[in-house]
């Protein structure tokens, strides 16, 4: 499972011009699910991201998690993160989970983030989404489990 996290001052996702999720300061999480992933992977990645220290403390060092910063979370499914881009001019998605598996694990991941006490907003699974964000920093990390 892959989480591309971006520290944002705000972010929103729309589908067909309908706002489906928006947050203020917090994390935008683009989530890629691979066929080898399971519920334990989702729980582990959620725990790791919720506690990953990417927010500044009073000394301007990255010592605070999104929990510490009392931030919000916007989770957007993105199967393209599971692409193999090592060869050729077209990505291979052979390691991506099936849509049913990915949707289930996406939901489990979101539930696990909420269980950490975080306000969680989401995109719409498998929809053609427009994501707008203001990356704070910019700060972007890729986490894998």
From Swiss-Prot:
Its main location: cytoplasm. GO terms for biological process: D-amino acid catabolic process. One of its GO terms (molecular function) is tRNA binding. GO terms for cellular component: cytoplasm. InterPro entries: Daa-tRNA_deacyls_DTD (IPR003732), DTD-like_sf (IPR023509). Keywords: Cytoplasm, Hydrolase, RNA-binding, tRNA-binding. Its EC number is 3.1.1.96. It is found in: Cytoplasm. A motif (Gly-cisPro motif, important for rejection of L-amino acids) lies at residues 137-138. It is an enzyme of class 3 (hydrolase). An aminoacyl-tRNA editing enzyme that deacylates mischarged D-aminoacyl-tRNAs. Also deacylates mischarged glycyl-tRNA(Ala), protecting cells against glycine mischarging by AlaRS. Acts via tRNA-based rather than protein-based catalysis; rejects L-amino acids rather than detecting D-amino acids in the active site. By recycling D-aminoacyl-tRNA to D-amino acids and free tRNA molecules, this enzyme counteracts the toxicity associated with the formation of D-aminoacyl-tRNA entities in vivo and helps enforce protein L-homochirality. A Gly-cisPro motif from one monomer fits into the active site of the other monomer to allow specific chiral rejection of L-amino acids. Belongs to the DTD family. This is D-aminoacyl-tRNA deacylase.
